[in-house]
Amino acid sequence: MQIPMLRLLAAIEDDDRRQVKKWLKANAALATAPVAHDTLYEREIVHWLYKGDTALHLAAAGYRLEIVRLLLAAGANANSAQNRRRSGPLHYAADGFITGPAWDEKRQVKTIACLLDAGAAIDTQDANAATALHRATRTQCAAAVEYLLHVGSDPTTRNKTGATAFHLAVQHTGRGGTGTDEAKMAQQHIIAAFISSGANPALKDGKGLSVIDRAKSACIRELLSGDG
C-alpha cells in the first residue's frame, strides 16, 4: 500500500488528475488509506501531512478541487481526523499562505464549499479546539473567513486558549505574512467580515477580555468601533 500511496500523493501535489484517476482505479482503498509517516510538503503544496492523514487532506491543503471531488467520489471521508492533531480536511483547506506563489483564494473557497457539501462538519475542533474558522483567520485567508461566516460557522467558539476566531482576527498571530501589506489588508477584510456577520466586538474570550480589549492597534480599534 505504501508505494502506491506515495505515488498518489505525488500526483496530488503535481495536480495530475489523470494519474490520480489511474491510482484510484487500480486501488480504490487508497481513497481512505492513512499515511504512515509525517511529511512536510514544500514544493507545490506547502503543508504538513501527518501520520493518519489521508490523500484528501493533501488535496484539500493544496485546493486541488477536482482531485478533492475524485477522492470524495471514491469514498474519501470528509470528516477524517485520525492524525495526532485531530485535524480534518476542512482544517487543511482553511489554512493558507497568502504571500506564497501558489496562493489562490477562489480555489480555496471552492474547496471548502466542496468539503462542506460532502458533509464536513463546519465547526469541528482539532486538538487545539480550533475550528476551520480559527485557522482561516489565523492565516489571514479573508475570502475563506467571509465564506465560512456566510455559511454558518460560529464566531463565538473558543479554542484551547479561550480565544474565538474574532479575537484572533484583531491580533498578530505570526502567520499569514503578518506585517506585509497583503496581510494588513486581509486583516481589515477579515474584521469587516466578522462585523458584517453580526459578531459582537464585546464578545469575551476565556480570560474575560473582549475583542476590543485584545485589539492593540488604534486603526483596528477604530474599525471595531465603526469609525474606521
Regions found by a protein language model. Name each.
Residues Q2-L8, A33-A55, A81-T99, Q125-T131, ...:
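Ankyrin-repeat boundary/"N-cap" motif
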Residues M5-E13, K21, H57:
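Amphipathic alpha-helical repeat scaffolds
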Residues Q19, E66-I67, R107-T111, A143-A144, ...:
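Conserved ankyrin/ankyrin-like repeat signature
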Residues L24-L30, H37-D38, R69-N77, A113-A121, ...:
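Ankyrin repeat domain, specifically the short helix-to-loop turn at the C-terminus of the second helix
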Residues A143-E146, H150, T156-K207:
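Ankyrin-repeat and related helical/solenoid repeat scaffolds used for protein-protein interactions
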Residues I195, N200-G228:
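Leucine-rich solenoid repeat scaffolds
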